[in-house]
Amino acid sequence: MNMQSTDEKYMKEALKQAKKAYALEETPIGCVIVHEGKIIARGYNRRNTDKSPLAHAEISAIKKASKKLGDWRLEECTLYVTLEPCQMCAGAIIQSRIPRVVVGCMNPKAGCAGSVLNLLDVQAFNHQAEVKTKVLEEECSLMMKQFFRELRAKQKMKKKSLFSE
């Protein structure tokens, strides 16, 4: 299997995690971490569910991967995530020494793997990660767009019902 099809295979698994977030009415972001050709950790966004700003997909997956490997250093792992990491998640990726990050769609408002800035390639830091972007971009982007379209429609209906009383 070539690298492109391998990346697509694991991004599809990250998309499955994003669907779990979607089902909880969370922003649909999913993540998997792969070590030696096997998924060792999965995570999805749970900020509202857990009432925590730290409950991002990447943070959840990094915690699980560290526990699984018995080490905070994830030096032989690849992280797959459906949406470009924010600054907090990029920091966690650097701290956990993940060497490769594969991103589904970019985040022009808060992305820290190339959109707004690239924290994963700051040479002054003690670690950098190779970043591959736009893997299954259309599927990842469509899920985000659909989620926010539905959210806006729900908010509009709620607002309408408040003013119709």
Give the role of each language-model region.
Residues 29-37:
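Short beta-strand scaffold segments in enzyme catalytic cores
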Residues 47-49:
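A short acidic/small-residue loop/turn micro-motif
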